[in-house]
């Protein structure tokens, strides 16, 4: 999961354009095959086993214009699918939710950019209308954020919006149920780990990619399914592998 691909790096989830390119090259060298969220959904629904040997999904939250300017050309170059979760009430505007938290103003993609990246193989998902903490809203407000963002994107893009990402990773069971009831088929959290056959498709795990990550740490995080990529995570990974073999 990435948010921004820009210089200067102004928050943790921002990755420089050069580093993003090297990370995509790293995935290719390591033998990973990026898949779409529709592919992943099919895996959960049909339990089929014809995903590539080392599948990985690339996702972006918020839809900053630098995703279009810096990340999209690299994705096209490598022919990698990806998903970008848009805040429907701020398309073509600015990141007001970040500004309130002390971050600088940054432009978001508009409808023209969205239409172009869809043609280039990018899946558009919903990230609510206003990027709120959903569990802090009353039920009606939360349902509106989840449902109307989907409808707005569908109406403007003329295509189904099947995938959702929880702003801030903020969720509980009532929120998860709202997402299901709204007609989405998957939803992404910010919990780290691998997505297996028994993973809830409405609480998909993701690995956070941070601006300070070296290429070595990026590779380690992808391999271990962790947000940290340190030695203790590596030890825990191999212990889990051993435990799975013993069972």
Question: Could you say what each language-model-derived stretch is?
Answer:
Residues 1-58, 66, 136-247:
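C-terminal active-site subregion of NodB/CE4 polysaccharide deacetylases
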Residues 28, 73-80, 107-126, 180:
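Acidic (Asp/Glu)-rich catalytic clusters
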Residues 41-44, 69-70, 99-120, 147-148:
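Alpha-helical scaffolding within the catalytic cores
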Residues 79-101:
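A short, conserved beta-to-alpha structural element at the edge of catalytic cores
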Residues 83-85, 125, 185-188:
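Structural detector of well-ordered beta-strand residues that form the stable sheet scaffold
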Residues 86, 125-128, 163-168:
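Short beta-strand segments
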Residues 93-105, 132-139:
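Surface-exposed cleft-lining segments at the edges of enzyme active sites
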